Curated annotation (Swiss-Prot):
This is Hemolysin A. The gene is tlyA. It comes from Brachyspira hyodysenteriae (Treponema hyodysenteriae). It comes from the Bacteria. Pfam families: FtsJ, S4. SMART domains: S4. InterPro entries: Hemolysin_A/TlyA, RNA_MeTrfase_FtsJ_dom, S4_RNA-bd, S4_RNA-bd_sf, SAM-dependent_MTases_sf, TlyA. The lineage of its organism: Bacteria, Pseudomonadati, Spirochaetota, Spirochaetia, Brachyspirales.
Length: 240
Protein backbone atom coordinates (compact mmCIF):
# COMPACT_ATOMS: atom_id res chain seq x y z
CA UNK A 1 0.00 0.00 0.00
CA UNK A 2 1.13 3.56 -0.72
CA UNK A 3 1.92 5.72 2.27
CA UNK A 4 -0.68 8.38 1.38
CA UNK A 5 -3.35 5.69 1.04
CA UNK A 6 -2.48 4.33 4.47
CA UNK A 7 -2.49 7.71 6.20
CA UNK A 8 -5.91 8.56 4.77
CA UNK A 9 -7.45 5.09 5.28
CA UNK A 10 -6.40 5.09 8.94
CA UNK A 11 -8.38 8.28 9.50
CA UNK A 12 -5.50 10.66 10.06
CA UNK A 13 -6.77 12.98 7.31
CA UNK A 14 -10.04 13.94 5.67
CA UNK A 15 -8.78 13.27 2.15
CA UNK A 16 -5.95 11.59 0.32
CA UNK A 17 -4.68 14.97 -0.87
CA UNK A 18 -4.49 16.10 2.76
CA UNK A 19 -2.54 12.93 3.52
CA UNK A 20 -0.11 13.88 0.77
CA UNK A 21 0.22 17.35 2.27
CA UNK A 22 1.25 16.11 5.70
CA UNK A 23 3.66 13.60 4.15
CA UNK A 24 5.32 16.35 2.10
CA UNK A 25 5.43 18.52 5.23
CA UNK A 26 7.53 15.84 6.97
CA UNK A 27 4.90 14.78 9.49
CA UNK A 28 4.96 11.04 8.73
CA UNK A 29 7.59 8.59 9.99
CA UNK A 30 8.10 4.99 8.88
CA UNK A 31 10.05 2.88 11.36
CA UNK A 32 11.32 6.05 12.98
CA UNK A 33 12.51 7.62 9.72
CA UNK A 34 10.85 10.68 8.19
CA UNK A 35 9.43 9.84 4.74
CA UNK A 36 8.35 12.62 2.37
CA UNK A 37 7.44 10.48 -0.64
CA UNK A 38 3.67 10.13 -0.91
CA UNK A 39 4.09 7.02 -3.08
CA UNK A 40 6.37 5.24 -0.61
CA UNK A 41 5.36 1.58 -0.37
CA UNK A 42 4.77 0.28 3.12
CA UNK A 43 4.59 -3.25 4.52
CA UNK A 44 2.28 -4.70 7.14
CA UNK A 45 5.21 -4.91 9.53
CA UNK A 46 6.13 -1.22 9.23
CA UNK A 47 5.54 1.11 12.16
CA UNK A 48 3.85 4.30 10.95
CA UNK A 49 3.80 7.43 13.11
CA UNK A 50 1.91 10.58 12.14
CA UNK A 51 2.84 13.80 13.91
CA UNK A 52 0.06 16.31 13.29
CA UNK A 53 1.60 19.76 13.46
CA UNK A 54 0.17 21.41 10.36
CA UNK A 55 -1.52 24.72 11.15
CA UNK A 56 -3.86 24.74 8.14
CA UNK A 57 -5.83 22.18 6.14
CA UNK A 58 -3.13 22.23 3.45
CA UNK A 59 0.38 23.59 2.90
CA UNK A 60 -1.12 26.44 0.88
CA UNK A 61 -2.19 28.08 4.12
CA UNK A 62 1.44 28.38 5.17
CA UNK A 63 2.18 30.15 1.89
CA UNK A 64 -0.50 32.77 2.51
CA UNK A 65 0.62 33.09 6.14
CA UNK A 66 3.84 34.66 4.89
CA UNK A 67 1.84 37.40 3.18
CA UNK A 68 0.29 38.37 6.51
CA UNK A 69 3.73 38.53 8.09
CA UNK A 70 5.62 40.36 5.33
CA UNK A 71 2.91 42.50 3.73
CA UNK A 72 1.27 43.69 6.94
CA UNK A 73 -2.23 42.96 5.62
CA UNK A 74 -5.39 42.42 7.65
CA UNK A 75 -8.61 40.58 6.81
CA UNK A 76 -10.28 41.13 10.16
CA UNK A 77 -14.08 41.18 9.69
CA UNK A 78 -13.71 41.38 5.89
CA UNK A 79 -15.51 39.59 3.06
CA UNK A 80 -12.92 37.63 1.07
CA UNK A 81 -12.73 35.71 -2.19
CA UNK A 82 -10.36 32.75 -2.52
CA UNK A 83 -9.80 31.99 -6.21
CA UNK A 84 -8.51 28.46 -6.76
CA UNK A 85 -9.51 27.35 -3.27
CA UNK A 86 -8.90 23.62 -3.84
CA UNK A 87 -8.88 21.89 -0.44
CA UNK A 88 -9.00 25.23 1.36
CA UNK A 89 -5.52 26.15 2.61
CA UNK A 90 -5.92 29.85 1.77
CA UNK A 91 -9.53 29.86 3.01
CA UNK A 92 -8.49 28.32 6.32
CA UNK A 93 -5.72 30.89 6.70
CA UNK A 94 -8.14 33.76 6.03
CA UNK A 95 -10.59 32.47 8.63
CA UNK A 96 -7.87 32.04 11.22
CA UNK A 97 -6.92 35.68 10.62
CA UNK A 98 -10.44 36.89 11.33
CA UNK A 99 -12.20 36.97 7.96
CA UNK A 100 -15.96 37.46 8.31
CA UNK A 101 -16.81 35.36 5.24
CA UNK A 102 -14.85 33.60 2.50
CA UNK A 103 -16.16 32.71 -0.93
CA UNK A 104 -14.10 29.62 -1.84
CA UNK A 105 -14.13 29.38 -5.63
CA UNK A 106 -12.65 26.58 -7.69
CA UNK A 107 -13.02 25.12 -11.16
CA UNK A 108 -12.97 21.65 -9.62
CA UNK A 109 -15.61 19.74 -7.70
CA UNK A 110 -15.81 18.39 -4.15
CA UNK A 111 -12.25 19.40 -3.20
CA UNK A 112 -12.90 21.69 -0.23
CA UNK A 113 -12.33 19.79 3.01
CA UNK A 114 -15.36 18.81 5.06
CA UNK A 115 -14.75 21.13 8.00
CA UNK A 116 -14.59 24.19 5.72
CA UNK A 117 -17.50 23.07 3.57
CA UNK A 118 -19.61 22.97 6.74
CA UNK A 119 -18.34 26.24 8.19
CA UNK A 120 -21.10 28.87 8.00
CA UNK A 121 -18.47 31.52 7.22
CA UNK A 122 -17.55 29.73 3.98
CA UNK A 123 -19.49 29.78 0.71
CA UNK A 124 -18.23 27.05 -1.62
CA UNK A 125 -18.48 27.86 -5.33
CA UNK A 126 -17.59 24.76 -7.36
CA UNK A 127 -17.23 24.00 -11.06
CA UNK A 128 -16.70 27.70 -11.69
CA UNK A 129 -14.11 29.23 -14.00
CA UNK A 130 -12.50 32.32 -12.51
CA UNK A 131 -12.79 34.05 -15.90
CA UNK A 132 -16.57 34.09 -15.36
CA UNK A 133 -16.46 36.03 -12.08
CA UNK A 134 -18.96 38.90 -11.88
CA UNK A 135 -20.02 41.16 -9.02
CA UNK A 136 -23.68 40.08 -9.27
CA UNK A 137 -22.81 36.58 -8.02
CA UNK A 138 -22.00 38.00 -4.58
CA UNK A 139 -25.31 39.86 -4.07
CA UNK A 140 -24.67 42.60 -1.50
CA UNK A 141 -21.53 41.02 -0.04
CA UNK A 142 -18.94 41.90 -2.65
CA UNK A 143 -15.46 40.81 -1.50
CA UNK A 144 -13.03 43.56 -0.55
CA UNK A 145 -10.10 41.13 -0.28
CA UNK A 146 -9.02 38.62 -2.91
CA UNK A 147 -6.45 35.86 -2.64
CA UNK A 148 -5.63 33.45 -5.43
CA UNK A 149 -3.70 30.27 -6.11
CA UNK A 150 -4.34 28.98 -9.62
CA UNK A 151 -2.59 26.38 -11.77
CA UNK A 152 -2.49 25.56 -15.48
CA UNK A 153 -3.57 29.11 -16.32
CA UNK A 154 -1.73 32.41 -16.26
CA UNK A 155 -2.79 34.69 -13.44
CA UNK A 156 -2.67 37.51 -16.00
CA UNK A 157 -5.78 36.02 -17.63
CA UNK A 158 -7.74 36.57 -14.42
CA UNK A 159 -6.40 40.03 -13.51
CA UNK A 160 -8.55 42.01 -15.99
CA UNK A 161 -11.72 40.27 -14.80
CA UNK A 162 -10.92 41.11 -11.18
CA UNK A 163 -10.20 44.73 -12.08
CA UNK A 164 -13.43 45.09 -14.04
CA UNK A 165 -15.84 43.24 -11.75
CA UNK A 166 -14.37 43.72 -8.26
CA UNK A 167 -12.72 47.11 -8.44
CA UNK A 168 -13.82 48.06 -4.93
CA UNK A 169 -11.26 45.71 -3.40
CA UNK A 170 -8.82 46.81 -0.73
CA UNK A 171 -6.09 44.43 -1.87
CA UNK A 172 -5.31 41.28 -3.80
CA UNK A 173 -2.64 38.78 -2.79
CA UNK A 174 -1.85 36.16 -5.37
CA UNK A 175 0.54 33.28 -5.76
CA UNK A 176 2.49 33.65 -9.00
CA UNK A 177 3.79 30.40 -10.45
CA UNK A 178 6.42 31.05 -13.14
CA UNK A 179 5.93 27.57 -14.61
CA UNK A 180 2.40 28.60 -15.64
CA UNK A 181 3.43 32.09 -16.78
CA UNK A 182 6.31 30.94 -18.99
CA UNK A 183 6.41 30.37 -22.72
CA UNK A 184 6.27 26.69 -23.62
CA UNK A 185 9.95 26.54 -24.55
CA UNK A 186 11.06 28.06 -21.25
CA UNK A 187 9.92 25.13 -19.11
CA UNK A 188 12.28 22.16 -18.99
CA UNK A 189 11.24 18.54 -19.04
CA UNK A 190 9.38 17.74 -15.86
CA UNK A 191 7.80 21.19 -15.70
CA UNK A 192 10.52 22.84 -13.63
CA UNK A 193 12.17 26.24 -14.21
CA UNK A 194 15.70 26.02 -12.86
CA UNK A 195 17.25 29.17 -14.37
CA UNK A 196 17.11 31.94 -11.74
CA UNK A 197 17.46 34.76 -14.28
CA UNK A 198 14.74 33.31 -16.50
CA UNK A 199 12.43 32.80 -13.53
CA UNK A 200 12.89 36.43 -12.45
CA UNK A 201 12.20 37.60 -16.00
CA UNK A 202 8.98 35.57 -16.14
CA UNK A 203 7.88 36.94 -12.76
CA UNK A 204 8.53 40.55 -13.78
CA UNK A 205 6.67 40.03 -17.05
CA UNK A 206 3.62 38.61 -15.26
CA UNK A 207 3.57 41.47 -12.75
CA UNK A 208 3.93 44.03 -15.56
CA UNK A 209 0.87 42.57 -17.29
CA UNK A 210 -1.12 42.77 -14.06
CA UNK A 211 -0.06 46.40 -13.60
CA UNK A 212 -1.15 47.09 -17.19
CA UNK A 213 -4.66 45.99 -16.16
CA UNK A 214 -4.78 48.88 -13.67
CA UNK A 215 -3.32 47.38 -10.51
CA UNK A 216 -0.47 48.80 -8.43
CA UNK A 217 2.14 46.44 -7.02
CA UNK A 218 2.76 46.95 -3.30
CA UNK A 219 5.14 44.11 -2.53
CA UNK A 220 6.38 40.67 -3.51
CA UNK A 221 8.18 37.81 -1.79
CA UNK A 222 9.23 34.22 -2.40
CA UNK A 223 6.74 31.61 -1.25
CA UNK A 224 8.03 29.77 1.84
CA UNK A 225 7.06 26.45 0.26
CA UNK A 226 7.90 25.27 -3.25
CA UNK A 227 5.33 23.91 -5.66
CA UNK A 228 4.58 20.20 -5.88
CA UNK A 229 7.35 19.59 -8.44
CA UNK A 230 9.87 21.78 -6.64
CA UNK A 231 9.25 25.03 -8.50
CA UNK A 232 9.99 28.30 -6.73
CA UNK A 233 6.82 30.39 -6.51
CA UNK A 234 6.07 33.95 -5.41
CA UNK A 235 3.49 35.94 -3.48
CA UNK A 236 2.54 39.36 -4.82
CA UNK A 237 0.46 42.10 -3.19
CA UNK A 238 -1.62 44.46 -5.34
CA UNK A 239 -4.04 47.33 -4.80
CA UNK A 240 -6.11 49.40 -7.22
Amino acid sequence: MRLDEYVHSEGYTESRSKAQDIILAGCVFVNGVKVTSKAHKIKDTDNIEVVQNIKYVSRAGEKLEKAFVEFGISVENKICLDIGASTGGFTDCLLKHGAKKVYALDVGHNQLVYKLRNDNRVVSIEDFNAKDINKEMFNDEIPSVIVSDVSFISITKIAPIIFKELNNLEFWVTLIKPQFEAERGDVSKGGIIRDDILREKILNNAISKIIDCGFKEVNRTISPIKGAKGNIEYLAHFII
